[in-house]
């Protein structure tokens, strides 16, 4: 719908309402935030903004994908209009998101956080059964994790990372983390995706132990290093930082809520959805999650 109250250059302002969105509280600033296009793909655009001293990425996606943290989901026609803006669109964030002459209304943010899991319906027997289903699903899948194809030392390092994070050994955790991050190909390397799976599983285990409030402090050293060093791709950096803040993709959140008993849907359909993510990103996350859950 055109908005006759304003223009951008020679273009009338065009307002759209997204299907869904997730923006963490840090995006709600008093001052206007300006951003620039970082990368564009067939169904995804990534924009970089500075929030304080930290570079943050906002992702705009076409319908059909699962919502990600710090992202906006648009209808197909609206996303196609966004793609026509050229190579260097200007992004602005205030009480709406504006990309050149397109204004995207802000909705109530959808939940992508696992910091406050409901455990009212948790049953240990059900959890153990579902944990085994994840393990068997990975073992039986024709689509394999790229992480499994990395040299053996990365599996040893991932196991060391899990041991360190469970024991709250900050220095050992960081040493193992540095040996893992960035390993693999693509925008989100396999080791990075596996780390995200580990963190989701760790937050679940802390929740089951009534210790979820310690998560941010324990993984804080990882977040601090991600914010100050260029350790991996900017796209992967976004999702690792979100995970350190307790935020994950809606698909991964749903899987964790099925494990916790909060969601009563069957586990197989969501495993299939996660398997489809990226070249092997979904399987890499499941691999990391399984590694964490198999430790009991």
Residue ranges of predicted features:
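A contiguous, surface-oriented mixed alpha/beta subdomain in the mid-to-C-terminal portion of proteins
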Residues: 169-243
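Glycine/small-residue-rich hydrophobic helix-like segments
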Residues: 229-262, 270
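Phosphate/adenylate-binding glycine loop and adjacent helical scaffold
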Residues: 2-164, 170, 180, 191, ...
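Regular secondary-structure segments
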Residues: 158-166, 253-260
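Short, hydrophobic/amphipathic alpha-helical patches that form generic packing surfaces
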Residues: 163, 182, 194-204, 257, ...
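Acidic, carboxylate-rich catalytic segments that either coordinate divalent cations
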Residues: 251-296
